[in-house]
Amino acid sequence: MALALLGRHNKIASKSSKKDAIFFYALVLLPVIQFVIFYIIVNFNSILLSFQKYDLMSNGFTFLSGDNLFKNFSDVFNLNNRGLNLGGLVLNSVVLWLCTVAFGTIPAIVFSFYIYRKRLLYRFFKFFLFLPSVIPSILLTTVFRGYMVDFVSKIMGLTGDGLLDPMSSTAFPILLIYYIWISFGAQVLFYTNSMAQVSPSLIEAGQLDGCSETRLLTHVVLPGILSTVKTFIIVSIAGIFTNQMLLYNFYGNIYKAPDIATIGYFIYSMAAPGPSNYDNYPLMSAFGLCCSVVAIFAVFVVNRLFKRFER
């Protein structure tokens, strides 16, 4: 009888496991299909484009051959011939990333802690900091440029683009501060939710020991959200090569603001949809492939540094 009961139990368990398996596969099927189509297939096509050229006569792309097979990759290192400074693009992109990490992450953690502790006007700060993430970026750009920067420029007697003149020394710092501000929302949301996972007993123990708010943040809360901070920083490395700092919203084509351009702005501007940019697609694919290789290497290096720091 025991064997019969055991066999029946195994059949029930088998049916249950099959149902669980069917539910699991049905659940992950759509994301897997999306990953295959929009990542693997799209990127595979980008890799192929790196070894192609646009033929104006046939209005299509044809493969390069012979000595010209790697022509697009050699053109990547000759962007100066297009009136652009590759070194300047890299420098601006790295400065943008460093400032975003340094002056974006730290204030975001502080504001998140303030909201988490539910101090005075915390709801207002939560709304105010997250608002830029809800409003369309082009609307924010219009308001910022048309009603704030232009107003100050007129007061100072500046003409043209005023403080946002791409040839001036004020454009890049102003746009950098603006971008950091509108980027607060997502970080504050994630850090606040991560802080909510910290055990309340730890906070209470710290308060009983007489810890100040600063010590609660640095010794109790911050260690609990360190993995989230690390993830944000590592993921943001890819932004070095994709972040355009909303420059396209302000200036449009990259040749209107070459001195403050970033790698992301360059790629976005040169690969913007339209027949006039078809000729740029192979070069941008090769450029993106080079950036991907550097980004993968940088991610591994930073991740390894974090692991050493944790030890």
Language-model features: locations:
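A structural signal for multi-pass alpha-helical bundles of membrane permease subunits
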Residues: 16-311
